[in-house]
């Protein structure tokens, strides 16, 4: 069975703390590389995790089945729209977008392209949230 090819967009603290340590060690998929507009900072992160740095979003997307988006919320709409236009499945950290209309457009586009569009809350199972849920 062919391994799922994934990429990462945005290499800030969330990507570095919560995602890259797992994505770079798992054998069930192939981490193709990453893209970030801040290429100098991205180079340091990619070197640390031994992954390829792409200079263009399109170049990364064309080699991936799915992309994790960890960029600034203000960029989510444009980044996700472009990825869906390139027929790539998308996982994005919450929130999907800053405006409900943009979120609705992306959901419609994902449906049209028959691509997965998932919004994650990476602390859902943290001890604090689990305790709070239990107390409620």
Please identify what each model-predicted range represents.
Residues 1-49:
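N-terminal Rossmann-like dinucleotide-binding module
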Residues 49-91, 95-107:
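Beta-loop-alpha module in the N-terminal Rossmann-like domain of NAD(P)-dependent dehydrogenases
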Residues 98-136:
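A contiguous active-site-proximal alpha/beta segment in oxidoreductase catalytic domains
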Residues 15, 55, 92, 117-119:
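Hydrophobic residues in well-ordered beta-strands that form the structural core
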Residues 29, 65, 88, 115-116:
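Short, well-ordered coil/turn segments that N-cap beta-strands
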Residues 22-26, 45-48, 82-86, 105-113, ...:
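Alpha-helical structural signal in soluble globular domains
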Residues 12-14, 72-75, 123-125:
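Short beta->alpha connector loops
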């Amino acid at each position: 069975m062919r391994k799922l090819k994934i990429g990462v967009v945005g290499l800030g603290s969330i990507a570095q703390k919560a995602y890259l340590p797992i994505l770079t060690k798992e054998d069930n998929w192939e981490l193709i590389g990453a893209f970030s507009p801040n290429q100098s900072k991205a180079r340091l992160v990619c070197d640390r995790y031994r992954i390829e740095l792409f200079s263009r979003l399109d170049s990364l997307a064309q080699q991936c089945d799915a992309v994790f988006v960890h960029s600034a919320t203000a960029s989510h709409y444009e980044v996700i729209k472009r990825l869906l236009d390139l027929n790539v499945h998308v996982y994005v950290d919450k929130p999907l977008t800053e405006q409900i209309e943009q979120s609705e457009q992306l959901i419609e586009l994902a449906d049209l392209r028959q691509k997965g569009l998932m919004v994650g809350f990476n602390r859902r199972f943290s001890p604090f949230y689990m305790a709070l849920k239990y107390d409620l």
